[in-house]
Amino acid sequence: MRTEYCGQLRLSHVGQQVTLCGWVNRRRDLGSLIFIDMRDREGIVQVFFDPDRADALKLASELRNEFCIQVTGTVRARDAKNVNADMATGEIEVLASSLTIINRADSLPLDANHVNTEEARLKYRYLDLRRPEMAQRLKTRAKITSLVRRFMDDHGFLDIETPMLTKATPEGARDYLVPSRVHKGKFYALPQSPQLFKQLLMMSGFDRYYQIVKCFRDEDLRADRQPEFTQIDVETSFMTAPQVREVMEALVRHLWLEVKGVDLGDFPVMTFAEAERRYGSDKPDLRNPMELVDVADLLKSVEFAVFAGPANDPKGRVAALRVPGGAQLSRKQIDDYGNFVKIYGAKGLAYIKVNERAKGLDGINSPVAKFLTADIVEAILERTGAQDGDMIFFGADNNKVVADALGALRLKLGKDLSLTDEDKWAPLWVIDFPMFEDDGEGGLTAMHHPFTAPRDMTASELKTAPEGAVANAYDMVINGYEVGGGSVRIHNGEMQQTVFGILGINEQEQREKFGFLLDALKYGTPPHAGLAFGLDRLTMLLTGTDNIRDVIAFPKTTAAACLMTEAPSFANLAALTELGIQVVKKAENN
């Protein structure tokens, strides 16, 4: 039906007769002439109808936005004064000789001239996706997946599919369950990741695996999370963690070079402990120049319990955050930031305004100045590198509260005061995560997942001192987003059972949930390691949007609902009966 795409016409097509198919993006009726901007997935071109083609002109008068049409005409160069430098096709136009209205459009529920609500955009997603910026994002996503496949193929990885209907295993979030009709009362689980299957593939001898795969997690959603999402899933045998990172870093550098024309360079490597200490986060945004600086040793003897208490507590921390130019902040702004850090458990926000650095104690303004000596102030200013006009904020509490509160404040100030370089790319690897973390109930939970191997520990050593164990794990972070994470896996049955035991999974439960894995570990399991990237998040970064729903064709809301299809929906009674399921209705309040 078409010979060319609208958005691909250029000066090289001048004089050619073309047939285009697409939609009316805009129409301008000048009486004797009618102009339309005609759109398809590749872009927009100007088409005009003149009196010499009376039939086409007459039919064009009926056109309205979003009519689906076919146009045949001749490509012409525009006069110099009419060239539109803002359009890729702005040097040419198409003189229409014939027009076919394939389908008319009713009055549109979305307004192209205004910002539509996200609710309306999701309800009429098929119209929203016609917008050039949305089409471009999905085209970029398609390019990314194509580049990934070619790269992985070139590096000897095999694309192998794993099951969608599998067994529920504890991986941190709730599973989506699928009832079995054949096995009444039993359920499959949709995979949160192909984790165990890709490990089993390593045990099967397929030493380089990858898959672009859907995953499902029934968890409380955030703005950058979806109940179903896509992973670039990777696993290798006989490769060390640095070797895995080297190949995966090369993949991401390849993507940025091909999609953005940007060379990311070599990625720095930082330990989890250093990231938390310097940035208050395990996914630091290195575009932001501010860092947390420990000052507890300077404040142990001050007569101010808010500082002295944590400074003398082995589990406490006192840290300072220097804000360049922050002395300009008003009292109201400071109070607002004080309320902000309370969200993260902080009790308040002490500060020092540096007016004249050279004057020491006399050159600052601070509500806690009366508790500080001139020597202490000088030491704080020296350690933080403070200059005239800076602000120093303090966090004093346990380690977690200080890191969380000042880490979040650092990001907010970076944005509010334009200190974060939005034009920069700042990738890094974060390694050496804790193996376990406190579950809040006196036990331990895996920081990544139960199949991650510890660094340099035997099973007996791990069993004796699990709290201090370091995981052989690694996350890739770009501009403050965790885009991928992985680890070296446990390939020894004794170690795997030890980890299960530390997590409170008894032997009977181990057999019930992971018997197939424990059996497989008995038969010559190779050392293996892997990683998974979030394709949605990678695409979000590469397309410059901050909303993950912008890079998914048909996303869910933060309530895990599809406004277009109205999923989830009630199942009919016959289907439930066949599955042996009875829905229990909540009692209504009287």
Swiss-Prot record:
Compartment(s): Cytoplasm
UniProt-recorded Gene Ontology molecular function terms: aspartate-tRNA ligase activity; ATP binding; nucleic acid binding
InterPro entries: Aa-tRNA-synt_II, aa-tRNA-synth_II, aa-tRNA-synth_II/BPL/LPL, Asp-tRNA-ligase_1, Asp-tRNA-ligase_1_N, Asp/Asn-tRNA-synth_IIb, AspRS_core, GAD-like_sf
PROSITE patterns in alphabetical order: AA_TRNA_LIGASE_II
Region named Aspartate: 195-198
The protein's assembly and partners: Homodimer.
HAMAP family documented for this protein: Asp_tRNA_synth_type1
Protein name: Aspartate--tRNA ligase
UniProt organism field: Salmonella typhimurium (strain LT2 / SGSC1412 / ATCC 700720)
